[in-house]
Amino acid sequence: MRVRVSPTAPYKCNLTSFDLYIRDYTVLRMRILFIGPTRVGDTILATSIINHYINKYKSSEFTVVTSSVSQNLFKKMPQLQNLIIINKMRFSLHWLKIWSKVFIYRWDLVIDLRSSVLSYLVITKERKIFKGNNYDHKVVQFTKFLDTKEKIIPEIWFDKNDVDDAKKILPVEGPYIAIAPYSNWKSKDWALLNYEKLLQRNIFQNYTIILTGLSKDIADKEIMENLLSQKNLKVLNLFDVPLSQMGPIFSICDLFIGSDSGLMHLAASSGCKTIGLFGPTDDKVYGPWQNVVIKSKTSPHDN
């Protein structure tokens, strides 16, 4: 087919349909490389950046580099073209392997939250390298990083079908309160005995209690068994349920209570009212975004 083209246009005058497709695809599709954090909580907070660019560039395509513990968070991410998992190797050779997958492309934008050398070894029109601080909340830091006046919010991705599937996992009717008593650091955790005492209060009698986390983190197995077998409470054991399922489950809970952990941020980003229990970590930087923090001067485990 013949097309009239401006003399200044960089395209030849005799274009085929394939040429037009390639031209339009190149113009409309913005290719973005996102190098994300390692930990689940940081990754969830960083979804505020991804969502900002998804909304800004409706036809963009993302390649996301993330850790194995965070990969399930991206199952329903819009505009995701490729997900690259960091499987650590000796001498940091995993970065060479990742580079071999991304250097072949010309990127429109590279966003690097790790300040890694990888972002300097690819061709891109724009490169944004994040440098954090120890006093602003992470979302505030990300807002400054993006240099935007728009409100950015950490939100994970799931749909109505995911919520319907989540309801099928729950054999007992709600309303629900979710509790995640463990993190990856014992000093951040409130003693399990305190949760047992808390759940004896009358306010919890009308709720189904969801206990969740990783079973390998359970330190007080006897107390946990007592909690799970409470006769005056409806308690569900949802330990080791994947993150991709816990997000929709949290979205139908009335409240989340738990340690400073990835699950705390997952609950908050799913729209669940969240109470985060903090001790040695800084709630001003890592608190659940736009939710409630209870802070102790010492480790919650000691209280």
Describe these PLM feature segments.
Residues 2-10:
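Extreme N-terminal basic, low-complexity initiation segments
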Residues 3, 17-303:
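Catalytic machinery of carbohydrate-active enzymes
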